[in-house]
Amino acid sequence: MDKNRISAMLDGVDRYPFHMPGHKRNTALLGNEFPYDRDITEISGSDNLHDMSGVILEECNRASRLWGAVGAHILVNGSTCGILAAIRALAGHDRAVVVARNAHKSVYNGIELCRLRPTYLYPKMDAESGICGSITPGQVDAALSDAPDAKLVIVTSPTYEGVISDIAGIAAVAHARGASLLVDAAHGAHLGIGQMQAHPVTFGADIAICSLHKTLPAPTQTALALVGKTCPNSAAFAAQLAVFQTSSPSYILMEQSARCIHLLEQRGAELMAAWTERICAFEREVAHLTHLRLCFRGELPACAWAYDVGKLVISTRGTRLTGHALAELLRDEYKIEVEMAAGDYIIAMTSLADTDQGFSRLARALCEIDARTEADAERQGCFFPQLHAVDAPWQAADLPHLTVPTAQADGCVAAEYVWAYPPGIPLVVPGELVTGELLAALAQMQKSGTELHSTSGAMPQTLRVLED
């Protein structure tokens, strides 16, 4: 494979470094386990991530062409920095924002920083799996009608579980009402390559943020911001990236991002086709599961507009297994570690770097576990209630609060976030009313094996709530 421009530049660095970083590329002292020889700073012949004019700009232009965007930015602080920058550039301050309630916690951090008033979009839930479905254009239109001062709509597509929303329809509605569309596509970097579904940026997203490291062969923390042709202020977005992204970006991460882009440019269609075939072979191998179930295959539930087949969501509903128990069996007996376990399902994330052997190993394990699993129609599935927002998150964070036993928080207004990680989607947001139904759901999640976290770090024992 031909080298990308960043790799070629790093190969040519042969000057003694009287500059940062402090390791001075001294592999004789430090060893070769880490690529110190490629860890440079902004020296002559390199480039500046926040004022691109050379090799970094060339690789970003490659990414723009590959995904069909009008602009691209390599991100070394993960998708989080791109989301924060996009919110600050597009949403304004002290006004409404329309946001899917199943957004990542980085979105809520951006809402707090910009003192925005969220109008939430609640996706319908698939009754069989307990998984959130798509956001619809009709929901967005109604929300913008209720919040006419909103300048930004934020949706997640694909979701952590792989559910895709009608981005073209949502973009049309948002733009007709004078709002921009930010798509958190952190789990969709592979979309738009080969025969995979088109990427949100080609469907009308003004900015789409995708994590290269989640579904493509790139190291943790690498991500990409793709700018659409309708973005109202790409210069403001670039300026905000300089605020939320490090001023000392790692050339190691940027090089690996460029290598990933280069690989997709040269072999993307071939690799995506092979990946798709492996998924199809896996589906055939698990087609006769009796108790466990591979979700979102065949006819999709009404609540899902489309689905990313690269996500393998295996449901344990109707069995004596929880998702956590299934994950533990796979880990302990089959040496397979899945991405996430919830009360009623597991998520196995796949990518073009998976092998035939890896897929077959998972399929055999699931078939063996399924054969010895018993049905249990009595076991209740985990459903999460829709909550009522009394205050905006930033308002609740600024108000006097106290700490109470979680079981006694019914009727109080939350003053902190509660979430399960992964995926980092808040179950409770500051300013939301705590109900008995919510407390029962949290208790059920904990009983099933889900670890709950909170801003104070005291969940599940106590919860911060607003004073009366």
Tell me what each language-model feature is.
Residues 74, 120-122, 210, 340, ...:
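Structural signal for conserved beta-strand scaffold positions within catalytic alpha/beta enzyme cores
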